[in-house]
A protein has these predicted regions:
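Active-site-adjacent bridging/hinge elements
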Residues: 93-103
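Alpha-helical phosphate/pyrophosphate-handling elements in metalloenzyme active cores
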Residues: 109-143
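An active-site-proximal "capping" alpha-helix that borders the catalytic cofactor pocket
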Residues: 1-2, 122-130, 177-191
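Divalent-cation-assisted or electrostatically stabilized phosphate/pyrophosphate-binding catalytic cores
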Residues: 21, 25, 55-58, 114-116, ...
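Histidine/acidic-rich helix-loop-helix segments that form or flank divalent-metal centers
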Residues: 2-61, 66-90, 137, 144-145, ...
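Acidic/His metal-coordination segments adjacent to aromatic residues that form catalytic metal sites
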Residues: 15-19, 101-108
Length: 204
């Protein structure tokens, strides 16, 4: 049966001002990491700002207070999101961040434009809500959410090749799939495995 208590739990969460629970701390860490990554992108365009360094350091200092959370320490090790040679996990996060700037259907003018990263999150959200409406168990809800969140990860490698183009040549879909798997292994799965993240690779 559909999860009848979802709305009540959602309302209770937003009414509760205590933000010290584990999920809230994970959300805080993700917020600071993403904000630091974004700031690192725009920082070179504002080199004359005297506060540049202090702003950049503020993100790392906030994350330093959350290093008891699994993965946070590795993400910021050596200021990973301000570094040209981050850890395996930091490198994967940087790769995923690139999808924020990759536009879907880039050759087809649309208003508003949508990014690949935004599309992936939207699919993940729908997958979770559809799972709720179907009465799926918690494990399936989580699996469906993350399947949606990473379903277009290969577009990091093949960029925006629209479906009509893929279908216009008989062998193109299979060739693209083979290339995607090869490059995912080389650029994503291989480095993560080498960095000790085999469990993450298995889930991806």
């Amino acid at each position: 049966a559909p999860d009848e208590g979802f709305w009540e739990r959602l309302s209770a969460y937003h009414r509760n001002r205590d933000r010290t629970s584990l999920p809230d701390r994970i959300l805080t860490a993700a917020h600071h990491y993403a904000s630091g990554w974004e700031y690192n992108v725009i920082k070179p365009f504002n080199t004359f700002d005297e506060e540049n360094q202090s702003i950049a350091e503020s993100f790392t200092e906030r994350l330093d207070g959350l290093t008891d959370l699994c993965g946070v320490n590795e993400l910021i090790q050596g200021h990973a999101f301000f570094s040209d040679s981050p850890t395996a996990l930091g490198r994967f996060a940087k790769l995923c961040g690139q999808l924020r700037f990759q536009i879907r259907w880039a050759d087809t003018p649309r208003v508003p434009e949508t990014s690949v990263l935004g599309h992936m999150f939207l699919v993940a959200g729908y997958a979770y809500f559809f799972s709720l409406s179907l009465g799926a168990c918690p494990a399936r809800r989580i699996n469906n959410f993350f399947a949606g969140l990473f379903h277009d990860l290969p577009e990091l490698l093949t960029r925006d090749i629209i479906t009509p183009v893929k279908r216009s040549v008989n062998q193109l879909p299979s060739l693209l799939r083979a290339y995607e798997l090869q490059e995912l292994e080389r650029r994503v799965f291989g480095p993560l495995s080498a960095g000790g993240h085999d469990r993450l690779v298995e889930r991806l």
